[in-house]
């Protein structure tokens, strides 16, 4: 995962440097790197920070031939904290670009604030649908994806496989809604239930009990990071493999596999390429 992150962050950094038309050759390029470094969600943010630091080491601490400073900040996966940090990065630190941002609800919280300040905003992960297409801004660039894309692949796969009905589950925030919207765009079978869980939830016993009662032939789940680890482990402990086939996006991936180990066996998923998969 580090190799993958380094390539991504190096690309982001290099692209950003090319757009700093208002930075003189003598100036230091300042990058505000906002990610989640605390709590259960810190598993992904720590990987992003490690990748950025390794990329800067490979680049000799420079971007576009200029000295560069990367300021890391912890958004705590809280929109209000993200807004405060964005304000600090823009007004106090006077960064040339804000990047990072894992969570789509945080990207939605800071998007207008950053882009309207004429600061470049580059997403390393979050790709909420409202800021794509007609909602795209000239000061925003995404180096990852638009949230709907990966689940669209799973929706098509399950439609082509002839799966007649499915139970849906996702966290109740922007990316969760985008994921299920993307899935339903290509899957045309029966939706038995569409369940939204709390963002950051760690106990899924109530949801698994309801799912067991519904006994769907297939279940499609988006639960990223630590949520995915907890969900998959509890799914296994509850013996849910005998109840329903599990299909996922970002629940079983390079971030969660080290913790899941054999608990991931049996889950099917669509995913962007990773050396871990």
Regions picked out by a protein language model, each given a short descriptive name:
Residues 43-48, 58, 62-131, 143, ...:
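Beta-alpha junction/loop-to-helix N-cap segments that form part of ligand/metal-binding clefts
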